Amino acid sequence: YKYKNANYGIGKIKRHWSFSPRTSLILSNNARPSTSIYFDIKGSKSDGYPLPWINRWSLEGFNSFLSNTNNPKNAMLMGLRMVIQPINNFKFELIKTSQWGGVGYASDLSALQASLLGNTNENRNKNINQMAGFGLSYKTIINKLPIRLYSQSIGEDEVGYLPNCYMHIIGSEIGELSSKFISKFGLEYVDTRIDLSSNGNCGPGTSYNNNTYKYTNYDRSLGAAIDGDSKLIMLRGSTALSKNMNINYSIGKVIINNYNNPRHRLSNAREKGLLSTLATTWDLNSLKLNGKITYQNFGLNESTKGLGLTFSAKYTF
């Protein structure tokens, strides 16, 4: 349902909450989307505010049911994201998610309020798992080259209603280096390791876990694909060979399960190595074809080292 500059609905929506084109620490395409009730609102010039930046904002929210092996049945995920553009070429995001409810846990108005605003480290709503943080994106031109810098920091715990125990993304992009092809090249660093805080909280095993909920859907991380206690540095690029054909390529060095946790979802032991990809997309009007070749020189619980190939086709009637 659409009303003015707002949309409301129910459905399975893929969400990628990050200024990084590849990675989000809090909500990404790594896990399958779940059915949610949602809204999104965007600022408009017709709002009539005298300062232009007040009109350049968006707000998105949802509440969905998760499906996992180890989480309480019918546990829910609530999310809110606000993006503001105070000046040209600079964007700022505030993000928050809460896992709450499920069989055996409160899902009443008190729990709803705590999921939105409350301190959930104590009392009857201490089961609620909250994550929150912020992100930045800034674009500029240096020597005729368009350059974008971005970052995201997400806290896995709260102290005095504010996020604490952070994971981080930092990255950059350079675009359009050729007059013949439109290309982008980027460098990105992702770190989901969390150190011990000054009061002895957090530390290894904290990211994407708490005592009640695992931050997953269908047992895959809702955030970064490398899951918790891991890090990745990746060089990537994309080239539009034509209006209908794109090529994406990347190579990265990754460490999975840095602290050798035997209960890590991706690997029972620490693994490190190289990961490279080459992907193509053909958009032929109603038919869309995707192909991807991957290579990794390390093994994980559900993937072996070596070459991998995937192919998909989508036809729209």
Residue spans for each PLM region:
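Exposed, low-structure sequence patches enriched in small/polar residues
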Residues: 90-98, 102-317
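Outer-membrane beta-barrel channel domains
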Residues: 1-86, 182-189, 206, 211-229, ...
